[in-house]
């Protein structure tokens, strides 16, 4: 079994991933990306991971020439490899204001650039939904508004 968690920075992915690892005895894998399709498949075949970002983030945050997979390879992963490796996909989202607050709290922005951050985050959230739709990913959407306390109280 594998669990892939994707979503905009500041939605609570890492918090959820760490709690799932503790609860299910799975290994935590954070953002380090395989170099090609074969490496993605090998990691999923090995199994037992909670991936805090996997292949979808690179389509959202990178330009086409920086991506390590094509759209066709992404579809292959979601249509063939995910089901064969018992991989569950979670998409974590939160309101833009919540994301901005969390990013500022951890030093990844400041109050002077909130209008720019708002535009950027809305774009990222929209791009995630577009990429998931294009790839035909069946996913469970999680509301990341509750934060760490919500995850702890409900596990």
Language model regions located:
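Short, solvent-exposed loop/turn segments at secondary-structure junctions
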Residues: 10-11, 55-57, 95-97, 146-148
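A glycine- and Lys/Arg-enriched "phosphate-lid" helix/loop adjacent to the NTP-binding pocket
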Residues: 79-130
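Conserved substrate/cofactor phosphate-moiety recognition/catalytic segment
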Residues: 8-11, 15-66
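Substrate-gripping "pore-loop 1 plus following alpha2 helix"
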Residues: 64-79
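NTP-dependent small-molecule kinase module
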Residues: 19, 108-109, 117-155
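Walker A (P-loop) ATP-phosphate-binding motif of ABC ATPase nucleotide-binding domains
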Residues: 2
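Glycine-rich, phosphate-binding/catalytic loops in enzymes
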Residues: 22, 66-69, 106-109
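Hydrophobic anchor at the beta1->P-loop junction of P-loop NTPases
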Residues: 5
